[in-house]
Curated annotation (Swiss-Prot):
Its EC number is 2.1.1.174. This is Ribosomal RNA large subunit methyltransferase G. Keywords: Cytoplasm, Methyltransferase, rRNA processing, S-adenosyl-L-methionine, Transferase. One of its GO terms (cellular component) is cytoplasm. It is found in: Cytoplasm. It catalyses: guanosine(1835) in 23S rRNA + S-adenosyl-L-methionine = N(2)-methylguanosine(1835) in 23S rRNA + S-adenosyl-L-homocysteine + H(+). GO terms for molecular function: 23S rRNA (guanine(1835)-N(2))-methyltransferase activity; nucleic acid binding; rRNA (guanine-N2-)-methyltransferase activity. The keyword Transferase applies. Specifically methylates the guanine in position 1835 (m2G1835) of 23S rRNA. HAMAP family: 23SrRNA_methyltr_G. The lineage of its organism: Bacteria, Pseudomonadati, Pseudomonadota, Gammaproteobacteria, Alteromonadales.
Length: 377
């Protein structure tokens, strides 16, 4: 794994968060390098600068290295991005007092003079971000977006024109391009949220724009809902909760239990909380945590059931280290006799990991694509 970042005379040591031993993963990509090169070569750095979707702080660390006094407005939906950026600033002895933090639902201040962004995988979320920027940016403000060249096409440029202003793409460099968009100064109204029903479980679900499975139940969640464990549980964790559908169903099945919803996405946690209220579940029994797995979950919380539908990507990177961390956290936090109940694609072979960690693993249900596994501490 490469950790030495060197671009345009800027030298940094950058790590992913949480740390990964996978040799093909690093804390930045060529699009980060292209953005920084374009910015410096253009000689038109303007502050305050908003930095959006900066995976682990490569962009904010680079600008802080150039001038530690530049005010930066850092917006992220991922808790791991916040923690990784903080860690990399400390590691490189960079100040933090020039950073102002915003979640993906916060409104950036209207003093922003320049925006640096990475293109997220979820284009519905990206359109939402452009619309929010249209509400605060003056006409003529530049927005620079770094992305893989293969992700940039006429439809994406039309998305800019529709939601923020005219845009054009640079020449390719290391298979990336930088899109330059000029704000037209016309505020766009944000769309209403998506709401849909799961009648067989008497649930109504709403999703914010960066939450997986925007308007339907994904196949993994479907098989999981049909095969939740029977019994009495006092403390249940929906780990990687997304819109919270597993935890909501758990609240119906185990009405006396406290249900803890945890996700790396702030929008996911907000969606789960809204869904708890919308489905009129017991007040005081739902608890919501924006966290990197169970890293900061209070130590007095000892679950006897952890439900988990693990992701197998972090941003653009395909990886199983998040699932591995989830399983490790579950083993660490479950009370003795507690159960980890997961769903995953069959080809991911999660049974091998669970057998290694828990010394036991039972197949609860399966179909052609998915398998539900259970391990007991």
């Amino acid at each position: 794994m490469t950790t030495q970042f060197s671009v345009a005379g800027i030298e940094l040591e950058l790590f992913r968060y949480p740390a990964s031993q996978e040799s093909n993963l690093q804390a930045w990509d060529a699009a980060d390098e292209h953005l920084i090169n374009s910015l410096i070569e253009g000689g038109q750095i303007a502050v305050p600068t908003a930095i959006i979707n900066d995976s682990f702080g490569a962009l904010s660390c680079a600008l802080s290295r150039i001038n530690p006094n530049w005010p930066l407005r850092v917006e992220t939906d991922a808790r791991t991005s916040f923690l990784g950026t903080e860690q990399n600033h400390h590691r490189n002895q960079l100040p933090m007092d020039n950073l102002q933090w915003f979640t993906s639902r916060d409104t950036l201040p209207k003093d922003v003079a320049l925006v640096l962004m990475k293109l997220p995988k979820n284009l519905t979320y990206f359109a939402h971000q452009l619309m929010r920027l249209s509400q605060i940016l003056p006409a003529g403000c530049r927005v620079l977006v770094g992305a893989k060249a293969k992700s940039i096409n006429s439809s994406l440029l039309a998305l800019f024109a529709k939601h923020l202003g005219p845009a054009n793409a640079s020449l390719a460099w290391k298979k990336t391009r930088v899109i330059t968009c000029i704000s037209d100064g016309k505020p766009r109204a944000l769309p209403n949220g998506i709401t849909w029903n799961i009648p067989e479980f008497n649930l109504t679900i709403s999703n914010l724009s960066n939450v997986f499975a925007a308007n339907k139940l994904d196949i993994g969640a479907r098989i999981m809902l049909d095969n939740l464990p029977q019994g009495k549980f006092n403390t249940v964790v929906d780990l990687g909760c997304g819109n919270g559908v597993l935890g909501l169903r758990a609240a119906q099945l185990y009405p006396n239990a406290d249900i803890h919803f945890i996700d790396d996405s702030e929008m996911a946690v907000a969606s789960a909380k809204a869904n708890w209220t919308m489905n009129q579940l017991a007040e005081g029994k739902g608890h919501f945590h924006w966290d990197d797995c169970m890293t900061h979950l209070p130590e007095d919380i000892e679950p006897d059931l952890v439900l988990c539908n693990p992701p197998f990507h972090q941003g653009e990177a395909i990886t199983d280290h998040i699932a591995w961390q989830m399983f490790l956290d579950a083993r660490r936090r479950l009370k003795n006799g507690g159960i980890l109940h997961i769903v995953g694609n069959r080809h991911l072979a999660y049974h091998v990991k669970l057998q290694r960690l828990f010394k036991n693993c039972t197949t609860v249900a399966s179909n052609g694509k998915f398998v539900i596994l259970q391990a007991q501490k």
